[in-house]
Amino acid sequence: AGGRLPVFAKQPAPVQVTWLGHPATTGLPGMHWRITDVHAEPPGMTEHLNTERLYRMPEVFCCYQPSASPDPFAGLPADQDGRFTFGCFNNFAKVTPPVIACWGEILRQTPHARLLLEVHGAQDAAFVQDIRQRFVTAGAQATQIDILPRQANQQYVLYRQVDLALDPFPCCGGTTSCDSLWMGVPFVTLAGRSFVSRMGVTLLHNTGLDELIADSEAQYIAKAV
């Protein structure tokens, strides 16, 4: 993230503060504070995971500057093509085996829906086939998995094809989730017990969408379907 932590290790300033860029403690004795918020890290939950003292913003830890203004809302994709679309445009490294198991069950329960993924390396047919097979093993049909290559700065446009986004866990989305909400697409998140697993919690709470915050994988599945 270009944070130049070796500089901070030399403590050039009497008080040093970290914010954003890295969703966890720096581990540096000379870093005195880390900016977070009361929803991402409620008092008493994560102090033991941080070498810094936590400065909790009263609402949300971040600001968001969209890359472009969205086109006028043209209706839900499901109403246009008759098929409900789940989507995830996070780094695919976040889509761990437990996430695939969870999403596979969601697709098993919604056989007419599809999952749209944006994956670096999607030009490799063997890699794409491997991803599809993982979801099939988890209960989905191969035809329910649509995989696109990374779209760089045009990623937000893909949300026009999505009805509901799925937040991975335990490493959930940050900017990707902000893009989703900006484009009018809500997402389901699983609340964890660390900052990196609760970014979705604070973003949904601060946009009035608490009903999309799940406390268990079973609840996550139920909210999605």
Which residues are covered by each model-predicted region?
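Repeat-solenoid scaffold signature
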Residues: 1-17, 21-25, 211-215, 219-221
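Active-site-proximal region of nucleotide-activated glycan assembly enzymes
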Residues: 10-72, 76
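Conserved catalytic-core segment of nucleotide-activated headgroup transferases in glycan assembly
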Residues: 59-152, 158
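Catalytic binding pocket for nucleotide-activated donors in carbohydrate/polymer assembly enzymes
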Residues: 160, 164, 168-225
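Short, charged, surface-exposed secondary-structure boundary motifs
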Residues: 3-5, 25-31, 43-49, 176, ...
